[in-house]
Amino acid sequence: MNIETLVLGPLQTNCYILNFEKEALLVDPAADAELIMKKLHEKEWSLKGILLTHTHFDHMGAVDAIVKATGAPLYCPYKDAPGLRDWGKNLSLHFTRHTMQVDTVPAVLLHEWDTVPFGNERLRVLEAPGHTVGSVCYEGEDFLFSGDTLFYHGYGRTDIPGGSEEQLSQSLSRLLTLENRTVYPGHGQPTSLEDERIFFGF
């Protein structure tokens, strides 16, 4: 399995494309649906699903257009689903002065320990509240999509609607107890759980 990164949108959000043979899975299609679709067409990849780590506007701006073009199912954390249509929760007006909502109805609302099969992997859902009420991470055999919970030498904001410093601290502690994996965050460069354990003195 290969993982490619596109940095998209006004907040430079990482959109990840997982590829196995001729199939693809998207994580957080932030913006620029045309660019994402161009990539899929160039590679002749069939899109099998779209995963959201949370429902802030900068992680889901291309969802509707991509679903319309491909019919791919949307997987959304159930506790964060209200943010798909609520601009107060998805922060679109707060950051851009424009409201944004996702009209696509999720095919699957994800809960703790659910798995998403793809290729030779089963991505496991780990609830990681703190940045938002319903943030999740997706754990693979040797990688972790951490959304805005864990960054390279940092972590997501909690001074926003739905944020909780206490919950984020608990989520970070949980992630840092996992076996070492490459971490693909919502913003910035990849890291590893081993490096972050050292950085946080865990």
Show which residues each predicted segment covers.
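Short secondary-structure boundary segments
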Residues: 29, 54-55, 78-79, 140, ...
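Conserved S/T- and glycine-rich ATP-binding loop of Class I adenylate-forming
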Residues: 18, 53, 128
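Conserved N-terminal entry element of GNAT/NAT acetyltransferase domains
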Residues: 1-3, 118-122
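Conserved beta-strand hairpin/beta-sheet module of binuclear metal-dependent hydrolase folds
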Residues: 1-43, 137-147
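Active-site HxH/HxHxD metal-binding segment of metal-dependent hydrolases
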Residues: 32-117
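Metallo-beta-lactamase
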Residues: 24, 90-93, 122-202
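Hydrophobic/aromatic beta-strand patches that form the interior of the parallel beta-sheet core
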Residues: 4, 51, 75, 108-110, ...
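Aromatic/hydrophobic pocket-lining residues that form the small-molecule binding cavity
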Residues: 29, 60, 168, 172
